[in-house]
From Swiss-Prot:
The RxLR-dEER motif acts to carry the protein into the host cell cytoplasm through binding to cell surface phosphatidylinositol-3-phosphate. This is RxLR effector protein PexRD1. Transmembrane segments: none annotated. It comes from Phytophthora infestans (strain T30-4) (Potato late blight agent). The lineage of its organism: Eukaryota, Sar, Stramenopiles, Oomycota, Peronosporales. Residues 1-19 form the signal peptide. Keywords: Host nucleus, Secreted, Signal, Virulence. The gene is PexRD1.
Amino acid sequence: MRACNTLLPTAIVLTSCDALSAHRAQIMNVATSDLISPIESTVQDDNYDRQLRGFYATENTDPVNNQDTAHEDGEERVNVATVLGKGDEAWDDALMRLAYQHWFDGGKTSDGMRLIMDLPAKGEALRHPNWGKYIKYLEFVKEKKKEAADAAAVAALKRRRTYRGWYVDGKTEKDVRKIFGLPATGKAKNHPNWADFQEYLNVVREYSKVVFK
């Protein structure tokens, strides 16, 4: 009997944890979508974007239940920030950056973002509740492009250092072709490493001019 009494609370706790996990996932969807004002349901986009824009769009599709649940849904959306971030601006920014990253990875243009955020196709919309978020997205894109450019520059420097190392080590053109998986002679413009091989040749020419100047 004592064993049964011990197992019962444990089962209740595990069941509660499962329920909380499901509820937490639901709350995350609501929280992210709540940061962008509702837009018309006629805007076509993928499911993930719709979740980010409006959780209620998937929850209240029944017109009969819309009136009954509108007030409850409104209260839930209002309480989400309190439950997760307590209205913390930094928390909201973090959620928005997740959305921005998703849209950036998906190749969303400024025009595409205007559509998602229900902004006019052109011009400023300073009084629109999503205008500030749109501007922040443009800043996010600029930041990401700079990061990509910096990373590309660092990668190029590393490649040049590697190529100079091969030259100093006495590797021949045949050796390097083998490293790149290229044929021993001739052009291979369709090979994915052909451009790298051409870069290697340019680096060797530049370096040899400096060494034997």
